[in-house]
Amino acid sequence: MSEMAELSELYEESSDLQMDVMPGEGDLPQMEVGSGSRELSLRPSRNGAQPQLEEEGPMEEEEAQPMAAPEGKRSLASGPNAGEQPGQVAGADFESEDEGEEFDDWEDDYDYPEEEQLSGAGYRVSAALEEADKMFLRTREPALDGGFQMHYEKTPFDQLAFIEELFSLMVVNRLTEELGCDEIIDRE
């Protein structure tokens, strides 16, 4: 538990350090955001002092020196040391892999709803209900239009005929999809 206390102290210290430096007040030159290059812009300081011309492009020293790993430290590409397994974490403070698992236990106990396995009959029933719901949503607007015509324009509207037609379309469409009759109907 002392490791957690040390980590939280380090986090608080780094947060405090970040809060101490406000943008524009540090000694670092301002760069154009999103320019994609390392060109520094000519900007006045916040205090109203004369703008300073900053250098442009990467430093020549950076270009000349290749990136090299510090001597005495191992890189990850060098492979495991003798006696160390390829998957092991090499660290002085990390005693065992079991310590980190206590935080992951809640994932094993949680049941994700999208991972539920439905039985064949239950899946078919839910699929039929979803299809009926989609059909209802698609036909709601014409039904409202039909009701509007019935009440306001005094045109004859047979609600029973409309319901029969709607239900037959739902059933016929569903059966043709399930039985694969789409090709047969299209050929005729």
From Swiss-Prot:
Region annotated Disordered sits at 1-122
Subcellular location field: Nucleus; Cytoplasm
What cellular component terms from Gene Ontology apply here? Answer: cytoplasm; nucleoplasm
User: Which InterPro entries does the record cross-reference, listed alphabetically?
Assistant: EID
Region Interaction with NR0B2, as annotated, extends over 55-121
Q: Where is the composition biased (Acidic residues)?
A: 53-64, 94-117
Q: What else is known?
A: Inhibition of MYOD1 may be partly due to the ability of EID1 to bind and inhibit EP300 histone acetyltransferase activity.
Q: How does it assemble?
A: Interacts via its LXCXE motif with the entire pocket region of RB1. Interacts with EP300, NR0B2 and TRIM27.
Q: What is this protein called?
A: EP300-interacting inhibitor of differentiation 1
Please report the organism this UniProt entry assigns to the protein.
Answer: Pongo abelii (Sumatran orangutan)
